[in-house]
Amino acid sequence: MILCSSKNLTLPKPEESFFSDLLVVGGGCSGLAAISAAADLGIENSLLLEKEESLGGRLGKCTEEISGLFAKTVQPKELLSHFSLFLENYEVPHRVGVEVEEIYFLSGEALSIAHAQDEASAYRYLLKAKTKEGSCFFIGKALILAVGALTPEENVAVSSLIEEEKKTGSPRLFPAGQSLAPSQSIAEAVQSGGAVGRTVGEMLLKEKHKQGF
């Protein structure tokens, strides 16, 4: 995964891209918690992207009971079933087998990519991804990174981008789980993802309220 400048971006046509209010990259415990929390607040136009062929991450591999989330301990696969049922009941879109290769922060002329969409300037991130069918593009107003521990290079790039975003007065990039703190346990990652999902969800709802939706 590479964070790139939009100066180097060859803009795809709007009809070649998928537009969402919220993009969550990573379908592990923190990503599932994040998009579930946002959906619970009423965010409907969201999309979860996972590079593996199934959701769950550590929840599908770990066998140790998880404590600290509920009154009693739960098995990882029980928690995964809980999230899967939530996504189904709330009809939360998600795609597997999607590997995000490049992330672009849209600014200046690059925002013209959303010229056919309402509120074009609200779209902040473009993701170039690889699937079995080929390359595709995802564009979102907010981006949650829940991809596990970042490499040192990725961590520096994300930190720099977050600092750059602060200048806009409206941050739209949010690391969660092990992307935020590599040593997080499953319970901590779920809590982190849920907190980030609520923060982003509340931000998007406030914006819609201001626009009269």
Locate each region found by the language model.
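Residues forming the flavin
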Residues: 1-213
